[in-house]
Amino acid sequence: MVLLLQYTLIFASVLMLVALGGCFAERSGVINIGLEGIMVIGALGGALVMKFLPVSLGAPLMVISTILAAALFGMLFSLLLAVAAINFKADQTITGTAMNMLATAGATVAVKAMNTAASGGNDVSSDISYVHSKDLFLVRLGSFEFSWFMLVAVICLVVSYVLQIGRAHV
């Protein structure tokens, strides 16, 4: 049961940050249905950067590089929605849905192609050397461990809620 709770907290933090971004986008008048696709492309970019970084780089620098690459890939992919909606006056809902499908399919094809090329024709996942970088993502309280992204997500959630409550009374 504890393991289930740990993994729930680890994976929920990313989804909480994406949902919070969606709330801010909605408040500004943008219907960003493409958030899931942006998240997938960001994850793909982070994984690709981690795969091709040298093993001797060191865990802290590898984690920072991976997070920055994931953010950059996500921002570049989200630029598609901005260009389509602003420059081409495309419907945001249709474009966001198309971006989600494109991201999921594109990430699947990219990962399959990389794994097939790395394994010599077999469709087997290749290894990524983590160099103990998992320890940099975790906060330990006794035997219970959770991602520090969860702390960041909860802090962002509380701050945005407090700011929203403050605006409601003005």
Set out the residue ranges of the language-model regions.
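Conserved small/polar residues in nucleotide/adenosyl-binding loops
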Residues: 168-170
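Alpha-helical transmembrane segments within multi-pass membrane transporters and channels
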Residues: 56-104
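Hydrophobic alpha-helical segments embedded in the membrane of multi-pass proteins
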Residues: 12-21, 37-41, 76-79
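Transmembrane helix-bundle core of multi-pass membrane transporters
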Residues: 103-166
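Short, non-helical or kinked segments that cap or interrupt transmembrane helices
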Residues: 24-45, 64, 86-99
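Membrane-interface helix caps of multi-pass small-molecule transporters
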Residues: 24, 48, 52, 76-79, ...
